[in-house]
Amino acid sequence: MADGYEDLREDELPGPAYEGYESAELACPAERSGHVAVSDGRHMFVWGGYKSNQVRGLYDFYLPREELWIYNMETGRWKKINTEGDVPPSMSGSCAVCVDRVLYLFGGHHSRGNTNKFYMLDSRSTDRVLHWERIDCQGVPPSSKDKLGVWVYKNKLIFFGGYGYLPEDKVLGTFEFDETSFWNSSHPRGWNDHVHILDTETFIWSQPITTGKPPSPRAAHACATVGNKGFVFGGRYRDARMNDLHYLNLDTWEWNELIPQGICPVGRSWHSLTPVSSDHLFLFGGFTTDKQPLSDAWTYCISKNEWIKFNHPHTEKPRLWHTACASDEGEVIVFGGCANNLLVHHRAAHSNEILIFSVQPKSLVRLSLEAVICFKEMLANSWNCLPKHLLHSVNQRFGSNNTSGS
């Protein structure tokens, strides 16, 4: 699915260390865009998305739905786990979060269109295989959609915006049809500014009555939670890819638009926005109104209300419809996405590369381990003097691949 207009494809091919599960130690996941990735701080969980078909003239295809890839943020190594149970259909543009090592997945686009189903997967399970569970929630759910955003606050998942079908039930907020969707679909779609809450204890859907001026309807925007504020930046509405910044107070449900001082990032969709401290958000990549892929990075300082350009070594690696997760080590881990114009789908350059952005100083332990590995020939004879947990970390780091660091 594109971020508002184009259907790019319409068919589909048929413990903490995660050591005990039925898995395969492969090099890395396939290249992809439109996937989801969530983190528990030490591991990044990757599911879904799609890639280009290698046979010219055939559609892009969704990646296998039973595959869950786990990236160890400390060692830089991947592990594939095959899941069972109520496995979601292969999709792109879904929305996912990880809370207490439980993965929640909502919405997306599959071979038959948009969905509003809700799934969960408990990665803490001691079973030999991880199991998906489809949750039959109560209340009025959001409409079927993809490319929406989510905030996590207390025991609530708060979903905002997206692109999909007209709601079947009466909901609070605005829905704007995409006129072009009438041409190529029997189920026309559009953008919305709807806010929906799911209580993860009762699994009941509800809608808050918000105050203030809400953002315009949009899709392919990016959301981030800091404290009791749910931030949203950019996204696409009709022909515009925007650079406005808003937050929703998740206690009072009041919308506020922020007008930062100084320079600001250009308007974009399909970007990522990641909280990296109690006062900073990290923005990377995206796709402009004139269809240019972006490789710029910015930090937004909440207390100063200003954007600051972030210098990094990945300026030759634009990404859009990628994912980004923060680690416990002060890094942002970007995975996958497309490196060129995604809408020219037979030429789309999907990626399976990891890009690492160091947004905070590394810990002394991390610096020491990196020094040990850097000078491994000189220090190898002394490794057995290390505490067992540090020796394990050093040994695991060998064999790492597909990681480009900053």
From Swiss-Prot:
Compartments it resides in: Nucleus
Q: How is it modified after translation?
A: Autoubiquitinated by the CRL2(KLHDC2) E3 ligase complex.
Q: In which pathway does it act?
A: Protein modification; protein ubiquitination
- Map the Kelch repeats onto residue numbers: 31-85, 92-136, 148-207, 221-259, 271-311, 322-359
Q: What is its main location?
A: nucleus
Keyword Ubl conjugation (UniProt): yes
Entries under InterPro entries matching the protein: Kelch-typ_b-propeller
Keywords carried by this UniProt record:
Kelch repeat, Nucleus, Repeat, Ubl conjugation, Ubl conjugation pathway
**An example Gene Ontology biological process:** ubiquitin-dependent protein catabolic process via the C-end degron rule pathway
Q: Does the keyword Protease apply?
A: no
- Detail the disulphide connectivity of this chain as listed in its UniProt entry: none
What's a Gene Ontology MF term here? ubiquitin-like ligase-substrate adaptor activity
Which GO cellular component terms, listed alphabetically, does the Swiss-Prot or TrEMBL entry include? Answer: Cul2-RING ubiquitin ligase complex; nuclear body; nuclear membrane; nucleus
Question: What PANTHER family is this protein classified in?
Answer: KELCH DOMAIN-CONTAINING PROTEIN, KELCH DOMAIN-CONTAINING PROTEIN 2
The annotated subunit structure for this chain is: Component of a CRL2(KLHDC2) E3 ubiquitin-protein ligase complex, also named ECS(KLHDC2) complex, composed of CUL2, Elongin BC (ELOB and ELOC), RBX1 and substrate-specific adapter KLHDC2. May form oligomers as a KLHDC2-ELOB-ELOC complex; this interaction is autoinhibitory for the E3 ligase complex as the substrate-binding site of KLHDC2 is blocked in the oligomer. Interacts with CREB3; interaction is direct and specific as it does not interact with CREB1, ATF4, ATF6, JUN, FOS, CEBPA or herpes simplex virus transactivator VP16.
UniProt function note = Substrate-recognition component of a Cul2-RING (CRL2) E3 ubiquitin-protein ligase complex of the DesCEND (destruction via C-end degrons) pathway, which recognizes a C-degron located at the extreme C terminus of target proteins, leading to their ubiquitination and degradation. The C-degron recognized by the DesCEND pathway is usually a motif of less than ten residues and can be present in full-length proteins, truncated proteins or proteolytically cleaved forms.
Q: What is this protein called?
A: Kelch domain-containing protein 2
